[in-house]
Amino acid sequence: MTQRLLEHPFVRGLADGTLDRDVFRRYVAQDAFFLRAFLKAYALAAAKCDDFERACVFHDLMTGVLDELKLHRSYSATLGIDLDDVEPYAATTAYTDFLLRVAWHGSLAEIIAAMVPCMRVYQHLGNELAASLRPDHPYEQWIKTYAGDDFGQLCARLESLLDEIASNSPAVHDAYRYAMQCELDFFSAPMESAP
């Protein structure tokens, strides 16, 4: 699945800087909508923690999402997006509905399993794309954000929690697999949808 994401036209366009600005604008709007749900899911995960240290990890992860939303707000000004008035695409709705359903009704392990793919995919893409980043790249800030050490550390902390508490339950595996498919669908939606 990761290889399919790397070969996806959206990611290839992001990598070489040829991604159409309108496609990126639509992506930023959808991602901001998604990140609000991601933030809520982290908050619900923190509420399910009996362990103080685990709750602190989710606090840091929520701070990371807020930092991502700040990046999106900076894009919104230059791209002409009202991030408070985003109509979600079907792929975005499917992903956020799944994420919030798991966050409300799933175990802590299931919530983490549903969230790790997003973190891991973005970190992996950021690192892969940063390897060939040129100075005048139009999406340089996006790439640097997800290739950065801060994001990488957050990703590692979430994965460490998953390793620590995950069981071999089918629900945990299913949540992870479905979230990976949602990532692929999410990258496709801005390319297929007209404003």
Predicted segments with their positions:
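Short, flexible helix-adjacent loops and helix caps
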Residues: A15, L19, A43-D51, W104, ...
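Domain-length accessory/inserted modules outside core catalytic folds
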Residues: A37, A41, A47, I112, ...
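Long hydrophobic alpha-helical segments typical of transmembrane helices together
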Residues: E164-P195
